[in-house]
């Protein structure tokens, strides 16, 4: 999930209505990336609830995808760039099999229909570093998880050299730990 400062920046960059942004940040104006984890989680869950009630689904998706924490991760970006260079010329299936060896990219599988299924988090603990260890008492909207979706989309596009769309199949947060975090990546036309 987004860091609080990233979400606040993306809301501005996407020209979200000032009144909506005020509702999202109301009471959380001073929450930043250095705030205690519990306070950050409280703000982020509140922000997602406000976004879901004030914005259309596609706007929520775009905002959260742009908040992906690894977009600015020079370490992972370098590893993915090296992977893309080393696997140039391999089939999509071969590349996907090798992607499973890179930390933080989940367990990918190429399906017969050409889509990719990526298991990002199994068990009952959300893989999101912004909320790990925080007790979750209610189901959390898929909107929250689109940040991880954006992470996968960004890294897989760079690793595979193709344009992708991402969908959420299931989420630990939304299912209260009953289902894993699974995403579907679909190749899209350029």
Positions of PLM-derived features:
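Short, solvent-exposed loop/turn elements at beta->coil junctions and helix N-caps
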Residues: 168-174
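N-terminal accessory segment detector
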Residues: 1-140, 165, 178, 188-190
């Amino acid at each position: 999930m987004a860091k609080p400062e990233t979400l606040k920046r993306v809301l501005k960059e996407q020209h979200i209505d000032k009144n909506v942004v005020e509702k999202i940040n109301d009471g959380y104006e001073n929450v930043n990336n250095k705030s205690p984890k519990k306070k950050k989680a409280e703000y982020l869950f509140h922000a997602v609830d406000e976004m879901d009630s004030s914005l259309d689904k596609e706007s929520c998706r775009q905002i959260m995808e742009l908040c992906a924490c690894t977009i600015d991760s020079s370490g992972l970006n370098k590893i993915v760039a090296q992977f893309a260079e080393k696997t140039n010329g391999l089939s999509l299936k071969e590349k996907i099999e090798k992607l499973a060896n890179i930390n933080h990219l989940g367990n990918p599988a190429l399906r017969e229909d050409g889509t990719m299924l990526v298991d990002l988090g199994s068990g009952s603990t959300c893989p999101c570093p912004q909320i790990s260890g925080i007790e979750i008492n209610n189901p959390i909207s898929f909107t929250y998880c689109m940040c991880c979706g954006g992470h996968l989309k960004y890294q897989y596009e760079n690793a595979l050299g193709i344009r992708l769309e991402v969908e959420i199949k299931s989420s630990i947060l939304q299912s209260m730990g009953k289902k894993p975090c699974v995403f579907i990546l679909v190749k899209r036309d350029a």
